[in-house]
Amino acid sequence: MLGRMYDIATRQSALDLVAQGHSLNSVSKQTGISRAAIRAWQVRIEPLPRMLIDLAPCPRCRPEPGTPDDTAAYSYLLGLYLGDGCISPHPRGSFYLRIACADAWPGLIEACRAAITAVRPEGGVYNLQKQGYAMVTSYWRHWPCLFPQHGAGRKHERPIILEPWQQEIVDAHTWEFVRGLIHPDGCRATNWTTRTIGGETRRYEYPRYWFSNVSGDIRRLFTDALDRLGVEWKQANARNISVARRASVALMDAHIGSKH
């Protein structure tokens, strides 16, 4: 069993005590957790997946491949995955979907968890806490089926092209897709400038949205989506896209807003 009933926070707290110099015996007595469980967590903190219990059918593996039931949630999750997500294999043949979410934006963490749950209601979602961010994680053998952009190496080192069925979802839920891209790789910022009018220097502030990604393919997916939505944008430099026109910022505010 090795403490499978304990959540990630409890496991991490026990490991923190060990890291502070406490012995396994003393941590076990203090927490009531067996030494065997703590020792196992030193090797692997994540709960062991239910290898033989995978009841959720994959919509892409049906005789007639389909899409997730909640396509709006999928469009948002696709944006999150392309921004700060990855799919990593488990030695026994299944996969983890992991989305990195900064601790500074707890609302983003909850939105990410909700999207994963909506796309795969039968599965579990948990946060693996790291320094400054949470790795929102879900285990399923079919994650690569839903995110065929998964592959060896970093995203900016390989082509990122949506499958036709993904593009249909993004076309139907474009704002959700843009929100998913902005949340990990973008922000709403306030710039300012000064002007001298009649001998008086005045400060003017104006908001804008930024999106940054090393992958040219992902930046293109973002700007193509903005074009469909009627949002004006500019390529600020090699990696950054800027939305600064007042009407376009207002449109983004109505559908995206600041992270929280």
Go through each PLM region and give its residues.
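Internal intein/HINT superfamily modules and their associated LAGLIDADG
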Residues: 1-260
